[in-house]
Each structure stands twice: as structure tokens, then as C-alpha cells.
């Protein structure tokens, strides 16, 4: 499974990392990144893929932004950069230890990177949704994505992930997913990244 990185609805989980109020004015393309993450969350709900939400020190950084649409998800609070806290690990265990992780949120060079490294060290397959991940600095964001790719992470886009998950226009949920793709994902400034690919 770790060979080519083909996503499946079975054995996958969506990790939503730290999309909180205090980050709103400082994160590059925050609104568009959250919009893409919200689409991923909606799709995973439709496809019955479990979701885990974290908040970094919410007392200081505030709650998850409402436009993510994460009502009903109880956030796992943390101070570590990695999402892989004891409570998150316990949740993953209760979900049957999914082996494919769809990862989005902020910041790319900090919590996203540390989470991805922890997951990779556990032998899990990590799919980072590049247009649903950002940082305060575009430089940090792009270098983090490049570095994570070197470590074996699969990079994709929101639309790419959703289409991989359904795989066929005959999928029973395809029309619902198609509605989420009616408008192209907003630009999050990733074109510069492709000069290094």
C-alpha cells in the first residue's frame, strides 16, 4: 500500500490540525486553506471516513474557526507540535488503527511536519493535502512540503484526494462529492512549488 499511495475509503482517517482563530490574520492564504479543508471534512463525512481534530493551546490561540464546519468533532487539545498525543493515538486505536492518513491544517513546518514524521515512523502512509496546508511564511510552507516529500509523504490537492477516494462515477456517493467539486479549489499560491518538482 505504501508503494504508490493509492487512497482508499477503507482504512483511512482525516486529521485536521489546529485551524484556530488566532492564526486567522497571520497564516498565508488562511481563508482558502480552511475552505479546502472544509471540503475535505464534508467529503469524509459523506464517505464515512473518520476524522480527528486538534487544537494547539486553545486558551491562547482560540477555538477552531467556525467555517471549517467541524461542529460535532471534539477537539483534542495539545501543546506538542505533533498531533500524535495519547488521546489521538487512543482515538486511532478505537478506529481500528487506520493505515492511511489524510493530513491538513497548519503550520506546515511545525505541527504538520512533526505529525507526518511521527506517522511515518509508525509505518503509516501519509497524504498531505497541499492546498489545505499553510504557514505564516510561504517560504516555510514550500520548503516544508519539499522536505516532507523527501521523507516519503504523498502530496496531493483537495480535488485529487476526493476523486481518488471515489475512483468511479458509479460510486454511490459520487454525485454528492461532485457537488463539492462544482467550483475549482481556490488558489493558495502553490504554483511556485512546481518549479522545484
Swiss-Prot record:
PANTHER family reported for this sequence: HYDROLASE, ISOCHORISMATASE DOMAIN-CONTAINING PROTEIN 2
Organism: Danio rerio
Pfam families (alphabetical): Isochorismatase (PF00857)
GO cellular component, one term: cytoplasm
Protein name per Swiss-Prot or TrEMBL: Isochorismatase domain-containing protein 2
Annotated family: Belongs to the isochorismatase family.
Gene coding for it: isoc2
